[in-house]
């Protein structure tokens, strides 16, 4: 009897991304190669948890790396090795986050140069206006 072979999970990163010091906040995700406009950069992976557990963890963590993917489920990327988990907020982002079938995908909105920090708009976040925005964009809203 033969054992069926299992394919390793597909690499969720379509473009090379590196982690480095960010002028926005702590660490950031940076394009390690040029990325064309409107292309999938990659995915953020992590532990699938309930939204209730996500809120519990968010209250005790200094750095939140949790994304709600449905009304009941969230992904905690705190222990993930995916560099995109370090994607910071900007009021003038170069990328956008899409949730599709429970997957967290990041797409470029415009051409992104090698070495440029990848940013998304966190939108309605759980910070409830309590976190100062440090993106430095000309039209920064000031708070998350």
Each model region followed by its residue ranges:
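Conserved catalytic SET/PR domain of SAM-dependent protein methyltransferases, capturing the structural core
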Residues: 1-144
């Amino acid at each position: 009897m033969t054992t069926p072979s299992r394919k390793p999970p597909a690499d969720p990163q379509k473009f090379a991304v590196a982690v480095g010091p960010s002028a926005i906040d702590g660490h950031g995700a940076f394009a390690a190669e040029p990325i064309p406009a409107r292309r999938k950069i990659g995915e953020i992976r992590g532990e699938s948890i309930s939204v209730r557990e996500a809120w519990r963890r968010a209250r005790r963590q200094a750095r939140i790396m949790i994304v709600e993917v449905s009304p009941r489920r969230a992904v905690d990327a705190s222990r993930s090795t995916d560099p995109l988990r370090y994607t910071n907020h900007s009021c003038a982002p170069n990328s956008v986050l899409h949730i599709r079938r429970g997957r967290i995908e990041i797409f470029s909105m415009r051409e992104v140069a090698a070495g440029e920090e990848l940013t998304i708009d966190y939108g309605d976040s759980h910070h409830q206006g309590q976190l100062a925005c440090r993106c430095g964009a000309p039209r920064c809203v000031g708070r998350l």
